[in-house]
Amino acid sequence: MIDAGRRLFVEKGYAETATPEIVAAAGVTRGALYHHFEDKKALFQAVITSEAQAVAKSIEASSAPGDGPRVALIAGASAYFAAMAQPGRTRLLLMEAPAVLGWPAVAALDAENAEVSLRHGLAALLPEAGGLLGPLTTLLSAAFDRAAIAIEAGGERRDYEKAIAALVDGLADQLRR
C-alpha cells in the first residue's frame, strides 16, 4: 500500500489522490487499507517517513569511517542531493509533506533523519560552534532543501554541491577566528 500510495501521491499529489485509487493500485480492499492506516493522511505519513528514512540511509552510507569531518560532510551533501533526485522525492518531502502534515511534523521527522547526520557532521567539523550548532544546522538544512528544489527545477547539481562546500568552509573559517 505504501508503494501504491507513493506512486499516486507523486503522480497526482495528495489532494487529488483518492483512497479508492490507492486500494485499486495496491490490489487490496478498502478494509485492508483502514486496517493498517487510520486514513489517507496516515498512509501519506507512512510514505513520507519511508522517504525521509531512505534519504538518511543514503547520507549515512556516503562516507567511510576514516573520512575527516569536512570530507564526510561534503560526501553527505552529495548523497543528500543524489537521494533527493529520486523521482518525486523532492515534491513529496519538501512540498506536499509540509502542506499536508504541517511544518512542525515535517521538522520533527527531519530532525530524526537527515538533520541528525547534518548536526553530527557540523559538530565534528565545527566544535567551536557551541550554542550556534542548532541554528547553523537549521539554516544549512534549509539551504539543502532549497538547493534540492532548485536542482529538481533544472539547476546544476554540481554548482549546488560547490556552493554548499563554500558555505561550510566559510562557516569553518569564520568560527575559527
Predicted regions and their residues:
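Key DNA-contact positions within bacterial/archaeal DNA-binding proteins
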Residues: 31
